[in-house]
């Protein structure tokens, strides 16, 4: 009760916050513990505009190195490619053993004469895949002979990178209680711990607000996972399936989404979020486990571990049934990877407590003159705008917190809608 009383007393006896500051700090610790930090990249900020940086690793063709199978530092270098034939419907008929050709900047070597003569597939990309499987051609990623780079006029491929910066304005959320000093004293008289009661009330409700913002923003920015003939619209229809079939189908799609993220970003997925019913289907599938020995590794917010190692989080407030697979990776002290960035504003305070995210304030009702406790939290929530823009010039004017422009643009999280039979509830 002492902290609450001191905070209320400070509001009516002084114009300075310095006296009440230790109490403000102590009361704000609970909020961050309840935030879903496992599904969002967290970067604290003490500025009203949060700044984020992103590094792009590029090859000589200005492509992301992880999005192509092309190699440039070996026998088929960047300059050498200028003399290599591009694969087309016409050129594929003229290829012979030992020839090199390129397709989507990847170099291939022919292992036999007219390698495409017996392949009836009309789609050029699929025909190339068949030729690789049949050992008619191979991927040409060979390292160069030692003498290639010993001459003075040898061409060496550039290892390129680009550092981008984007900013998102810090925004606010504010809650207050109607609990007065008298009510707090009544709570104490009836056996309640009033300070803990107020802390839990405000911190829990504020964390619930922020978590909804995080989860709903994650739903917005995630790419939709569409597979021809299975999830053409971004939905998987499980409204007809038996429980084992539904669980097996949904778990299979989760595993495919993990592979998709790894292919598109090189990062391995670290979490899975599902609506309540979708999480129940995964649990019924038999591929969700929660053993007592897992507790030291599993977040207290998680439902359990899927068989592929991903912790499963349950979104109980979602208006739709869905499953999301995503990445949050802390790489060293400064580098964080994630689909959504959460930047709590620390008000410029140099605090020893790393969990401080906001401040409790005193609000006086002008009608009753009764002081009430309020919690003000400021933070920025952002996705990477460089996944949206057509070019760098356009990216500079995009706000990472503008979820209208960020919709469906993140390569670090993938969403699949789940169609389930409607629940009938008798009124």
UniProtKB/Swiss-Prot annotation:
- What name is this protein filed under? Capsid vertex protein
Mind listing the UniProt keywords for this protein, alphabetically?
A: Capsid protein, Late protein, Virion
Name the GO cellular-component terms: viral capsid
Q: Would I find Signal among this entry's keywords?
A: no
Name its species.
Escherichia phage AR1
What is known about what this protein does?
Answer: Capsid protein that self-associates to form pentons, building the capsid in association with hexamers of the major capsid protein and one dodecamer of the portal protein. The capsid vertex protein self-associates to form 11 pentons, building the T=13 laevo capsid in association with 160 hexamers of the major capsid protein.
Question: Residue span of the signal peptide, if any?
Answer: none
Membrane among the record's keywords? no
Spell out the subunit comment.
Homopentamer. Interacts with the portal protein. Interacts with the major capsid protein that forms hexamers.
Which family does the entry's similarity section mention?
Belongs to the Tevenvirinae capsid vertex family.
Q: Where does the entry annotate site (Cleavage)?
A: 10-11
Consult the record and explain the modifications the protein receives after translation.
Proteolytic cleavage at the N-terminus by the prohead core protein protease gives rise to the mature capsid vertex protein.
Highest rank taxon of the organism: Viruses
Q: Tell me what gene encodes this.
A: 24
């Amino acid at each position: 009760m002492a902290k609450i009383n001191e905070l209320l007393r400070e509001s009516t006896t002084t114009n300075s916050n310095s006296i009440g500051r230790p109490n403000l700090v102590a009361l704000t610790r609970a909020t961050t513990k309840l935030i879903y930090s496992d599904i969002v990249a967290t970067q604290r900020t003490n500025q009203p505009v949060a700044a984020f940086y992103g590094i792009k690793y590029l090859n000589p063709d200005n492509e992301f190195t992880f999005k192509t199978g092309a190699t440039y530092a070996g026998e088929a270098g960047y300059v050498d490619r200028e003399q290599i034939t591009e694969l087309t419907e016409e050129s594929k008929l003229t290829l012979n053993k030992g020839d090199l050709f390129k397709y989507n900047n990847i170099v291939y070597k022919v292992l036999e004469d007219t390698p495409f003569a017996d392949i009836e597939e009309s789609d050029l990309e699929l025909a190339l895949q068949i030729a690789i499987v049949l050992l008619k051609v191979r991927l040409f990623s060979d390292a160069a002979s030692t003498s290639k780079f010993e001459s003075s006029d040898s061409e060496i491929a550039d290892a390129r990178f680009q550092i981008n910066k984007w900013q998102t304005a810090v925004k606010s959320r504010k809650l207050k209680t109607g609990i007065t000093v008298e009510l707090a004293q009544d709570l104490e008289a009836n056996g309640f711990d009033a300070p803990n009661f107020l802390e839990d009330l405000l911190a829990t409700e504020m964390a619930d607000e922020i978590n909804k913002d995080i989860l709903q923003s994650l739903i917005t920015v995630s790419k939709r996972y569409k597979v021809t003939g299975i999830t053409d619209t971004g939905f998987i229809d499980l409204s007809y399936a038996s429980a084992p079939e539904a669980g097996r189908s949904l778990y299979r799609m989760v595993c495919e989404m993990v592979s998709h993220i790894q292919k598109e970003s090189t990062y391995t997925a670290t979490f899975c979020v599902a609506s309540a019913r979708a999480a129940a289907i995964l649990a019924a599938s038999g591929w969700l486990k929660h053993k007592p020995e897992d507790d030291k590794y599993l977040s207290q917010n998680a439902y359990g571990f899927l068989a592929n190692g991903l912790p499963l989080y349950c979104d109980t407030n979602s208006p739709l049934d869905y499953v999301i697979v995503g990445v949050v990776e802390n790489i060293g002290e400064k580098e964080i990877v994630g689909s959504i960035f959460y930047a709590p504003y620390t008000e410029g305070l140099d605090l020893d407590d790393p969990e401080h995210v906001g401040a409790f304030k005193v609000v006086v009702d002008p009608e009753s003159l009764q002081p009430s406790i309020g919690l003000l939290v400021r933070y920025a929530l952002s996705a990477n705008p460089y996944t949206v823009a057509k070019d760098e010039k356009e990216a500079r004017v995009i706000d990472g917190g503008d979820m209208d422009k960020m919709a469906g643009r993140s390569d670090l999280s993938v969403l699949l809608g789940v169609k389930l039979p409607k629940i009938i509830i008798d009124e």
